[in-house]
Amino acid sequence: MAGDKKFVEDITPMDEDFAQWYTDIVKKAELADYSSIRGCMIIRPNGYAIWENIQKYVDTKLKEYGHENVSMPIFIPENLLQKEKDHVEGFAPEVAWVTHGGDDELAERLCVRPTSETLFCEHYAKIVQSYKDLPKLYNQWCSVVRWEKTTRPFLRTTEFLWQEGHTIHETKEEAESHSLKILNMYSRLCEDMLAMPVVMGKKTDKEKFAGADDTYTIESLMHDGKALQAGTSHYLGQNFSKAFAIQFSDRNGKLDYPHYTTWAVTTRLIGAIIMVHGDNSGLKLPPRIAPTQAVIIPVAQHKEGVLEKAKELKEKLAKVVRVKLDDSDKMPGWKYSEYEMKGIPLRIEIGPKDIEKNQAVLVRRDNREKTIVSLDEIEIKVQEMLDIIHNSMLEEAKKTRDEKTYVATNMEEFEDTIENKPGFIKAMWCGDRACEDKIREVTGATSRCMPFEQEVVSDTCVCCGKKAKNLVYWGRAY
């Protein structure tokens, strides 16, 4: 029938056009659709359910750490945004402004929040007086607006969803420790939930957050060899506290400024899932983040007892996994392709012969392997299989990343690698901003991070040949 056309036929092969392959999956897997507003997207139920699972993980961890959720206004008065000079200069090109309320021109322009440091600082200045009031550990789930010039669903949009944490602490040591604690949590989110390996490290001064003392990052590598910043955690020092006059009486009765951290992950993680795990058949969802972990497909469901057994199986499995039964009248072959394209980690087939033998067939999305299991053990076997799939996807992603991580010791090697073998490039750097700028100008690669796990691949800077200070991961990035 015409309605049974296989969607996978419409997915552009990634080797042919990676950008189109990505867009095809976003649309065909019904993750998002384009809005009539430039750069904005409609996140559809399949996409939003992934975000909800990310939210559950992060929100649970934050509450374990003592954070509280709040909600700040969407608008920021212009005078408030101007208070931290480096911060406003960093965001000025991306700010959207509200100038009118109805037909009346506003006395002061309102910025649609690109991030909320200024709002949190204004509030903290009102409620913090003593060291006994610290730390303040606040987080909010919201959308922000940044007027991007080049957009792509999930990866870079004018409006996007995120969580933004804002905390203030009594000491520098406590704040820095907290910033790294959050980064570690983000790393576990990526590896334990998204099956996505990351490199943890510190940004260079050029790449750090506007107004920060230090920015820490997790960087992931996509199928096409481009890097993606998957999450950041910033130590802002006392810069914002001083700009907004947030003061507290310390343990000696003297006035001091608290130390600030801020950190975020966004819906771009959904784009990362697509580009790390997807293939030419479509989306490939890691089981722990997948809204539907298993789909039951009855074979020859018109035959007596098949549909009843499938429903019984769903009821049994629903107690231990997120499961769906497709009892529509579409052909099994169409369903196989449909759910493969939508990335459901595990397919469970059951037909008359399976029922006779008290068994079902499990088919993995990640490698299409089939396993026959007894219906008496199916709850345990399905859970075990989902863990196996997660571990396999993580190992495969690590293998791909490692195969696409190269070493360069001079600019000739660097340029040749970036043009012919896209991926991470490990190269030494002298610490001079001029060399960092030159590398970007010549190759289009940016410094992704100075990894916490430092190694020496050369004694000299890849760009100027002077004595090296740090190993840096470089790459072209989203």
Swiss-Prot record:
Keywords: Aminoacyl-tRNA synthetase, ATP-binding, Cytoplasm, Ligase, Nucleotide-binding, Protein biosynthesis
Molecular-function annotations in GO: ATP binding; catalytic activity, acting on a protein; proline-tRNA ligase activity; transferase activity
Localization: Cytoplasm
Ligase in keyword set: yes
EC number(s) given by UniProt: 6.1.1.15
Role of this protein: Catalyzes the attachment of proline to tRNA(Pro) in a two-step reaction: proline is first activated by ATP to form Pro-AMP and then transferred to the acceptor end of tRNA(Pro).
Quaternary context: Homodimer.
Similarity field: Belongs to the class-II aminoacyl-tRNA synthetase family. ProS type 3 subfamily.
UniProt comment concerning the protein's domains: Consists of three domains: the N-terminal catalytic domain, the anticodon-binding domain and the C-terminal extension.
Protein name, as recorded: Proline--tRNA ligase
Biological source species: Clostridium botulinum (strain Kyoto / Type A2)
